[in-house]
Amino acid sequence: MVTFSRRSLAALAAACALVSSGTSSAYAQQKPKIAVSSLTLPVFNPLVWNIMKASGFDAKNGFELDIHAYPSISAFYAAFSTGETEALIGGPTILQKLYQEGVPLRIFGTGFTLADLVVFAKDPNIKSLADLKGKQLAADMGGSQFQVIKIYTNAKGIDLGKDITVVNANFAVARAQLEADRVDAALVIEPLASITLRQSPSWKIIFNGAQGWKEITGQEGWEIVPALRAETIARLPEAPKMLLAALQDVANVLHKETDAADKIAVDTTKLPPGILKAAVDSGRLQMIVRPAWEPATRQSITDMMQRAVKAGFYQAMPDNKIIYAP
């Protein structure tokens, strides 16, 4: 008969506990990683990932978020295009361009609406984009936001670039040029819109992207939407649904726990306190997460792409595989 001393039993129990702990730790580490493109700029795009990571929504939904932050939008998209990262949240018409250039991407949901895209003017006599005829607008001509403005003005019979002179400038420079009276209007997005209204309350918003898009299409449009690379979906078939659930969790924090979201924005993107809250409370920052494969949502995304083709940005529509389907 084999007997054990009390000391031997204690040692055996400790060893079992250590093995059990190691097994649990190893199991926890088995969550698949998803590498995402983010930005070091003080904008709301990286805040989505920051809230997701800080709140543990990645682990809650079965994956580990691996954030890769880049100092420029071009590097942000380039990393996704080359496969350095596997997911991002980007402009639907920019993703359209990448797809047609051979990037194997799949749009699987929606993100921010066009409500945070605004055009500011200082002159009280300028009340709409039509009033900018013969004047100058500062805008980033390489961004999807400019494409939205171009599509809108086309629908209104305004030749943007001819009737309205466009000065190419990123959002911060566009705002600075309006401040210095070098242009008559500036295209900006959140959080710069809320910062601008705090610093220059006399400036007027003469165009809002969501309102303008609904005016010409009868439906909402999307500023940014989430996409995954096709090989990531092949490796991890549940990735779209896991990410979509985590994005919905982020949207809930933005809209229902705005003070907590504002604190994360201050801590991680160095935004002034209250700016995110102002953007959400004003209705300019609207995060609406829906599956892209639902018929109405798919149509709202592809409609933007069709209008980009009609406006002359691209020659043809992408095939149906650009939208993920379970």
Where in the sequence are the language-model features?
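Phosphate-coordinating loops and pocket residues in cytosolic domains that bind phosphorylated ligands
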Residues: 11, 134, 198
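Short, solvent-exposed loop/beta-turn-alpha elements that line the ligand-binding surface or hinge
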Residues: 59-60, 210-219, 287-296
